[in-house]
């Protein structure tokens, strides 16, 4: 099979000149190293075996060492002999079915190795980039008037890879049994260029030139490129401006690069017990486990499609643990990833062979991690005892499963809810070929065990009619007779509204039965996500770890509304809500609503990261305002569509304040402030307070300016913890004050800024550490810095004393000055007092910037990045906490961190990558390496830059921040008083 390639430049009078220079064999035959490595792994299975073929040729088939290779090679010989003048016909040794089987296998191999197959994660497209750039260079020569006429010849594979990069919309290259229609013998691609010689003079600019593409003498259409209705030659067809094509292909290249990142992500990180240096330092029990999932999902989608090794929806038990040896099924999960909470509204399906087992513990079957393939868009595993391979891909509300059987027999698919209260419901619908049901959701923390007022509705839909089915003990099953090589396709979907929502979600997200198409659409969602932050480095392991962290930071908050915008009203009112946003044509649009905000964790880094890079962040913030309007109070820790009062603080207010100050779009700022103000100034009545509404211990806080030890804060999941609450309320008050200032609420601003100094009431002037205090003003005089105490949340006094993010200079003064402050910071690390496994410590490494010692931040942060984040299942120091731990890594690896999220300042750490792009903002780190971690100097847009912080305005702009890195600290850079972060209390 040959490729001919030509370029034509045609003027308005239709005279043409061939202008293409020879595509050298080097360009045509080029295979990138990653493509070569990938192609070695590609070995698509055949539907038929080789037993009949080998038995027909040999009396003793057991003597054949590699029967599959022999059969394949003889087929290749038979094909080659068509061109030889011999009467010998090797095809006679094959049956028609075997010839077709091998033909389809070869076509699939071609597609996997050179086409747009999801499995290759864009490696073929990336391999074609150099060829495309060579073509562009040739075109540029022609546009400048440097004309030559040549012919180019090559093989089919470079053309196929080039087509994969171009992505023509009218090719069905996923039809692997029709590959010869895409790239037949003598396949050719032509690019015909047009310009008007009466109006345009050479050299021509790209926007002055029109181009059309001809594949095998037929026009092809490029997706997402605007086509002219009529070409310069007066004919209808697909004509494009050359500059639009250039922009389109560069986006395709960027997407292919992002797709390559997906292939490197280890989705198992955090699914096993921690193996980091922080292990057993201060954590206990499940705190020393990442509690993550190797889930398939759409970024911030509703449902996480995950393998399951643990049944039920018990608190602190994740659906999957890497250390488990048996698989129970595949779950449509709403687990609060990375925490010690619980799943809700979930269901599980499990494929079985020959033996019907209903209970999760009975149907659990062995599996090997070597047989697992896990990516953000795809999960697959072989189950040897079930004689099948299970594959899964999914989107926000719906997923598709493909079960391929390795022998003849009876196949079962078992479906159950994961309701621990025995309230789940399942049924079979033979008209829709589905199993459906619902799983009632219950509250925890406040109102523990009460119904939340909504269900997790679901359906499992089969492509083929049910041959047999049944229900027993709350478990439903469907059965099919299968032969070796057969596939059973299943779709599943969820809704928190009703069954109509389930079926609409399926229709909207997966209206067909094309597994690879569904997977490709999920890949597209991830490419868009990963492209918002692009990094490049010679250290490929660091890049993989970075994008793995970004993956884990993309679970929560989750989409809560259906595709039609409907969702159950917050706090159990049982109303169904919907927020219209106009129409596109006749299609109505609805605002997506989000749920499950692990607020004590994510206001620190995850939500600030989202405000920088994630367009959906504004919708997340507006969802908090919705909760206020629907429930009457701004929630403290909104999960399970309920008030919870889990953890401490009032950080929904802090998060909304950051969004207001940083001018988030499509946010009702006045209504948001109304919600924040109510939490900051009002005390909930007894009934509302018991239900989880309002700040905990607010009466004491307003009366004393701190929460005394006398107030045990009983109406909360975390009782006591008075000092930590005071410190966090002081920050929340500061944050709300900034929102008040931005909105012109001057009286509120003055009151709240005074309250922002309340942290001083719990720093003992005698010890200069945080300490418990009684209502009469007397101190507890605690001297234990390293043991957990009741008045501190999930940590020690040494951890929490540093939590004054809005008044670091005030804390410095309270500790006795800059030197004592710096010495205590040193001690945090030299005496192993620092614990990265939980949130209260995570801003501490960046506090060196305030004392003019940024090189220590650089060293501490680099150590944490390297040691506390490992690309292995036990690679997280503690709970990932809805992605907060991973968001810390993302921001810190980029080179900055928001010590005070509501402020416009981000403290510079140590950049990890040669180059990073955050939207339009660029960070370059010259000479960065494992040794060169220290900043020697910096420039911003070419001008010297000595501040040890950057601003939100810089991050949202199009500037370039460049660092020169070295192996030794430069104690001059960023150390002067004027280079340190501003005092936020002035």
How should each PLM-predicted stretch be described?
Residues 1-150, 154-257:
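Signature for phosphate-centric chemistry
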Residues 120-200, 569-583, 594-597, 767-791, ...:
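Extended hydrophobic/aromatic segments used for targeting, binding, or gating
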Residues 172-192, 622, 626-633, 638, ...:
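Catalytic or ion-translocation cores adjacent to nucleophile or general acid/base/metal-coordination motifs
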Residues 193-204, 394, 405-407, 925-929:
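Short, low-complexity Ser/Thr-rich regulatory SLiMs
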Residues 212, 937-939:
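Beta-strand signatures of extracellular beta-sandwich domains
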Residues 216, 940-943:
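Short strand-turn-strand beta-turns centered on an Asx-Gly dipeptide
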Residues 258-654, 660-727, 738-761, 767, ...:
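Accessory carbohydrate-recognition regions in carbohydrate-active enzymes
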Residues 732:
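ATP-dependent phospho-/nucleotidyl transfer catalytic cores
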């Amino acid at each position: 099979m040959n490729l001919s390639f030509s370029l034509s430049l045609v003027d308005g009078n239709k005279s043409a000149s061939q202008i293409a220079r020879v595509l050298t064999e080097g360009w045509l035959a080029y295979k990138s190293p990653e493509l070569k490595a990938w192609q070695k792994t590609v070995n698509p299975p055949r539907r038929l075996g080789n037993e009949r073929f080998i038995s027909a040729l040999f009396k003793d088939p057991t003597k054949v060492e590699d029967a599959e290779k022999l059969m394949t090679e003889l087929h290749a010989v038979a094909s080659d002999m068509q061109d030889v003048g011999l009467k010998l016909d090797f095809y006679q040794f094959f049956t028609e079915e075997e010839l077709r089987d091998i033909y389809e296998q070869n076509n699939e191999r071609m597609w996997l190795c050179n086409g747009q197959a999801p499995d290759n994660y864009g490696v073929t497209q990336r391999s074609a980039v150099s060829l495309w750039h060579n073509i562009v260079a040739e075109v540029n020569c022609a546009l400048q008037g440097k004309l030559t006429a040549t012919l180019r010849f090559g093989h089919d594979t470079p053309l196929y890879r080039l087509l994969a990069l171009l992505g023509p919309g009218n090719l069905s290259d996923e039809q692997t049994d029709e590959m010869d229609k895409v790239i037949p013998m003598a396949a050719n691609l032509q690019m015909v260029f047009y310009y008007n010689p009466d109006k345009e003079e050479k050299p021509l600019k790209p926007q002055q030139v029109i181009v059309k593409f001809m594949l095998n003498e037929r026009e092809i259409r490029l997706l997402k490129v605007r086509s002219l209705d009529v070409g310069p030659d007066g004919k209808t067809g697909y004509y494009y401006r050359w500059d639009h094509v250039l922009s389109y292909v560069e986006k395709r290249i960027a997407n292919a690069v992002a797709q390559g990142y997906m292939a490197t992500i280890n989705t198992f990180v955090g699914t096993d017990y921690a193996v980091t240096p922080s292990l057993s330092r201060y954590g206990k029990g499940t705190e020393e486990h990442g509690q993550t999932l190797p889930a398939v999902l759409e970024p911030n989608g509703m449902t996480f499609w995950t393998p399951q090794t643990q049944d039920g929806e018990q608190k602190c038990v994740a659906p999957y643990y890497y250390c488990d040896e048996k698989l129970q099924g595949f779950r449509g999960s709403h687990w609060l990833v990375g925490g010690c909470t619980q799943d809700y509204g979930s269901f599980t399906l499990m494929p079985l062979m020959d033996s019907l087992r209903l209970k999760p513990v009975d149907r659990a079957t062995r599996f090997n991690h070597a047989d697992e393939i896990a990516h953000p868009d795809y999960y697959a595993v072989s189950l040897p005892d079930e004689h099948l391979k299970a594959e899964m891909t999914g989107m926000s509300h719906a997923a598709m499963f493909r079960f391929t059987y390795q022998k003849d027999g009876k196949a079962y698919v078992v479906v159950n809810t994961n309701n621990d209260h025995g309230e789940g419901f399942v049924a079979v619908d033979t008209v829709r070929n589905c199993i459906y049901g619902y799983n009632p959701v219950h509250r925890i923390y406040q109102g523990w065990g009460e119904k939340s007022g909504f269900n997790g509705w679901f359906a499992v839909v089969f492509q083929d009619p049910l041959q047999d089915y049944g229900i027993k003990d709350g478990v439903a099953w469907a059965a099919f007779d299968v032969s070796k090589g057969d596939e059973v396709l299943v779709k599943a979907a969820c809704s928190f509204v009703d069954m109509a929502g389930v079926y609409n979600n399926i229709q909207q997200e997966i209206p067909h039965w094309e597994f690879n198409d569904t997977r490709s659409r999920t890949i597209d969602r991830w490419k868009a996500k990963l492209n918002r932050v692009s990094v490049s480095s010679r250290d490929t392991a660091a890049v993989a770890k970075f994008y793995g962290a970004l993956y884990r930071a993309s679970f929560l908050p989750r989409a809560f509304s259906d595709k039609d915008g409907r969702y159950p009203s917050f706090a159990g009112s049982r109303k169904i809500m919907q927020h219209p946003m106009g129409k596109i044509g006749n299609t109505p649009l609805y605002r997506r609503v989000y749920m499950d905000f692990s607020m004590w964790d994510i206001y620190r880094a995850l939500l600030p990261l989202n405000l920088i890079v994630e367009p959906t962040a504004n919708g997340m913030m507006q969802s908090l305002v919705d909760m206020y309007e629907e429930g009457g109070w701004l929630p403290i820790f909104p999960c399970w569509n309920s008030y919870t009062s889990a953890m401490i603080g009032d950080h929904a207010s802090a998060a909304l304040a950051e969004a207001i100050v940083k001018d988030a779009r499509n946010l009702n700022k006045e209504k948001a402030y109304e919600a924040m103000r109510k939490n900051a100034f009002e005390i909930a009545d007894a009934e509302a307070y018991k239900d989880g509404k309002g700040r905990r211990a607010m009466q004491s806080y307003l009366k004393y300016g701190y929460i005394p030890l006398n107030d045990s804060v009983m109406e909360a999941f975390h009782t006591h913890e008075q000092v930590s609450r005071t410190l966090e309320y002081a920050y929340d008050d500061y944050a709300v004050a900034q929102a008040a200032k931005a909105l012109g609420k001057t009286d509120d601003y003055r009151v709240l800024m005074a309250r922002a100094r309340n942290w001083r009431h719990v720093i003992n002037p005698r010890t200069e550490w945080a300490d418990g205090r009684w209502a009469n003003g007397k101190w507890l005089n605690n001297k234990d810095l390293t043991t957990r105490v009741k008045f501190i949340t999930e940590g020690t006094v040494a951890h929490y004393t540093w939590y004054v993010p809005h008044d670091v200079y005030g804390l410095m003064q309270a500790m006795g000055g800059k030197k004592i402050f710096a010495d205590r910071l040193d001690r945090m690390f030299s005496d192993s007092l620092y614990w990265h496994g939980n949130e209260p410590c995570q801003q501490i490494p960046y506090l060196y910037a305030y004392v003019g010692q940024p090189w220590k931040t650089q060293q501490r942060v680099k150590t944490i990045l390297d040691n506390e984040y490992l690309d292995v299942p036990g690679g997280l120091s503690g709970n990932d906490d809805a992605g907060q731990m991973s968001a810390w890594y993302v921001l810190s690896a980029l080179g900055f961190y928001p010590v005070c999220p509501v402020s416009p300042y981000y403290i510079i750490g140590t950049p990890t990558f040669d180059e990073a792009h955050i939207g339009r903002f660029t960070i370059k780190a010259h000479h960065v390496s494992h040794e060169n971690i220290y900043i020697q100097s910096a420039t911003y847009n070419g001008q010297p830059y000595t501040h040890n912080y950057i601003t939100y305005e810089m991050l949202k702009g199009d500037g370039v921040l460049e660092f020169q890195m070295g192996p030794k600290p430069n104690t001059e850079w960023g150390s002067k008083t004027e280079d340190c972060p501003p005092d936020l209390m002035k």
